[in-house]
Amino acid sequence: MKIISRHIALSFIAAWRKSCCKGYAILSASLFLAMASPILIGCVREPELHLHDGGDIIIKMPIVHLELDVFWDYVTDLGIPYDWTKEWYYGWDDYDKELFGTLGYEQPDAFNIRRYYTGMNPKAPHTQALSNYVNGFVLETSFNWGFWDILAWNDIKTIDDIQSLVFDEATTLDSVTAYTNMTMNSSRYHAPQFTRSFYQPEGLFAAYEQGIDINRNLNDFYFDEERGLWVKNINMLLEPITYIYLTQVIFHNNKGRVVAVEGNANLSGMARSVVLNSGIAGSDAIAVDYNVRFKKDCNMNGESVDIAGGRLMSFGMCNINGTRFAKTRAGVTRADDGLKHYMDVTMQFSNGMDSTFVFDVTDQVQTRYKGGVITVELDMDTVPIPRRKGGSGFDAVVVDYEDGGTYEFDM
């Protein structure tokens, strides 16, 4: 593939200036190419201008606002903007950061790029994928004339260099799917196809553009004299396709009854995977395994309460793109996926026995379809202490506190 060089471009401009009439204005490089034929009739040009066989593109990759109060832009049925900070009593101290990481999204700074050439047919099926890796937010590379599709997603970086996300690029060239694998922990509630829960994914952002026209007329190109290249800018907006949920079980009147939590919890009915190109989550419902921590004497509007809190990342609800859901359904404030969503947390009581509490949080998950705070409140004066011998108490099925605040125990 031939690339126009700075030397050739400058030599061409110099030759044109010397041989053409002095009465013509010197035009900018990008406009000069388009007007070269009618202006330069009878002029001698040396050296001959040879354009590259394709176009050079600079892709800038901005990212949507990562602040949770901007991304969680829900509006209630009453038209009141959602303020998650007024619901979140667990907090996020330095020890939480050490155990679980940051509370919100982290800014990525490196990206994987897949380029698909479709010839003269925009949005045609892909036959080959060209790979690029970018440090920073700009990709500069060469393209053949014709139409291109471009997919970008952030590189995954973890503290221990072990990532949960797996990317499937082999099944089809027309899309890339991300998923995670199963843990060794059991999944008992509303994950009928799987006996174990799944690892939560890392923060994942993606952008996909189709039918990018790299044409011989150099429409939308400009000439960069410093680099000696024709350039076309494409802005690709990366959006989150994994969603953060902040969970908290608030114990009123605990009085030392619950003293600890196991450390692992599950949120069920969530998607197993996501298609990067569309951002639409898969149809298989799973339980996502995540970590929780027990805090004593937290302040809740002046009341001292104990809280079991945690943060989980997931692909969101099945069969939807959480980021774009509200944009495509004006006025809709709830995503009804037809699934039940349970959060289970195993707690240890003061007598040394443990019990798994299972909370129906379907309404909260469907209302917070791209993440948010999930809260369950328990009045421990109404919760019996397990006393069965053998170290294991009961599994308590507790309905969503927004559905009336009653508690149903399956003893």
Regions found by a protein language model. Give the residues of each.
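Sec-dependent bacterial lipoprotein signal peptides
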Residues: 1-42
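Bacterial Sec-dependent N-terminal signal peptides
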Residues: 3, 35-72
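Beta-strand secondary-structure signal
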Residues: 54, 58-60, 149-151, 233-235, ...
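Structural motif
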Residues: 66-104, 249-258
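Tryptophan-paired
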Residues: 99-163, 259-365
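Short, low-hydrophobicity acidic/polar segments
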Residues: 119-239
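A sequence/structural signal for flexible, mid-protein segments enriched
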Residues: 199, 203-300
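Hydrophobic, glycine-enriched assembly/anchoring segments
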Residues: 355, 361-411
